[in-house]
Amino acid sequence: MSRVLLVCPEPLGHGHPAGVGVRFVEIARVLLNDGHDVLVLSPDAGKVDGCRADHLSHESFAAHSVASDVAVVQGHVANAFFLHAKPVPTVVDLYDPFIIENMNYWAERGAEVFQYDHLTLMGSLVRGDFFLCASEAQRLFYLGLMVATGRLNPMLFERDPRLESLIRLAPFGVQAPRPLKPQSSHDILFGGVYDWYDPVRAIDVVARVRESIPDATLTFTRHPNPDITPQGKLAEAIGYAQKKRYDFVRFEPWAAYAERAEYFEKFALALLTFPRSLETDLSMRTRIYDYLWCGLPIVTSSAPGTDELLVRYHAGTVIHDDAVEHHADAIVSILRERATFDAMRTGAQQFVREHQWDRTLAPLREFCRAPRFEKTKELFASQPAITERPPSILDRLRRRLRA
């Protein structure tokens, strides 16, 4: 079996991983179960049971890459990895289209974020050997970029017209099925708030729901890594709830990963509201998988990836406009009609059975059994410079204030 090096950009030791951290934890578990020797690098050297762990650093990249058969990287940490690691077959996980997500932070952080995101993505596309993404829409998006960089080239196309040796679908997954507990509450979960969501609309939706179901509540959760994830929309939601004096809106800590099922099971239903954009066309919502895992029916704004799952498994209701009353009517209907509620929970259980991590990560498992360099990657692609972003003035000021 292979010696696998996982390069995770998010802390794991606090036990409260968000989407990227969760994905790396589950990748580690699946590859460990396959018999591989797994080493996880992260900012805090957080441990995953059965795997070795170390800190992210220039020295650890160099030392551990020499002793590895394959590496898996994601996001901006790829810059330092490709700069300091020794050559090793490298899987680049593109499930999170960060270059599109982070465009929401333009007003707050300026052009620097996009410039660095662009440099990171282009460098990763040129230097990676195999790529993972979460949906067919993402796959076409990244293939377009690969044509532009020269990674999708005539030699590769002639050998593999479907390009499955270059990029494959490996969406999020869920853990083993859980028995569903009886549910009688009217508590509604939104979850974490990122700047591409519309939490104020969600608050207005539940305010309208309360006209029919007076004990309905709405819960948001605070991000475990606020220093690396701007929280402008969360602040907006807090201010709006305070202004309206809504005591049914709650803001709670992020649930520990090992305890999140018990936390989610307190809720009757999940709600997601967001404006339609390229980000919604490309993203696959991590929380959708967890909510379905715990049997929560979902009412959500329309996004292609989410729509397809909820429709296929009859596990929720998709609202194709921004109307507060349409979201609210859907929630009231689900909570009041037990047959509809139970049918959606049954659909969620079917989803869980078909989206176990060992199935969704099958392309990665296959690559790790026989790692390889992509021999055509240097023949047509231009090599952009690799730059590790220096701390901005704002970043330095934040660190000084926290010290």
Which sequence ranges carry the predicted segments?
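C-terminal amphipathic helix plus adjacent low-complexity
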Residues: 162-163, 350-403
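Conserved acidic donor-binding segment of nucleotide-sugar-dependent glycosyltransferases
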Residues: 312-313, 317-324, 333-338
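N-terminal subdomain of nucleotide-sugar transferases
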Residues: 1-45, 201, 208-211, 391-403
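Membrane-proximal helix-turn-helix segments that form the acceptor-binding/catalytic region
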Residues: 111-131, 139, 155-161
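Nucleotide-sugar-dependent
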Residues: 197, 256-263, 270-290, 300-308
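Nucleotide-activated donor-binding/catalytic signature segment of Leloir-type glycosyltransferases, i.e.
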Residues: 222-224, 231-264
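Active-site proximal beta-strand in glycosyltransferases
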Residues: 4, 85-108, 113-115, 125, ...
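Conserved donor-binding/catalytic core segment of Leloir-type glycosyltransferases
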Residues: 5-8, 171-198, 202-210, 218-222, ...
